Amino acid sequence: MDLLAINSAATLFVSGEIDDWAPVRERGIDTIVDMDGTVDPGLSEAPNQVLYVYWPILDEDLPCLPRLEVLGRLVADLVGTDHRVLVHCRLGFNRSVLVIATALTHLGMSGEQALRHLRQLRPGALFNETFAEHVRALPARRIRVEVV
């Protein structure tokens, strides 16, 4: 499994399918967002108290945009409160990167900046042009995380 840190704080990661839970445990990941069509094999080996979000989408047309926004905001909120989040799909290039790019816009990057950043870290990312065009059009937004 190729686990790649997206931010310098190493709180946001992308990967393909999880086939080894050791890197997840080693990096202290406490939230997994699974975009693939199958539940991860060996899920019972996941670290205790990991939040597992399962939202399978096809690597074709854009998913339901309001739900994509909610998921992007959730990832941004978690990263903004020092959780360690892994977003993954089968290969870690399109669906997972779409969600991460959406989250990055909620953390203040424009869609174009997010796309450039993600492609620099992961060459070939967002080769689904429908997804890439959507990301390019996203404005920079800054969430305000409130911890009660």
Where are these regions (language model features)?
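A phosphate-binding catalytic loop at a beta-strand-loop-alpha-helix junction
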Residues: 78, 82-101
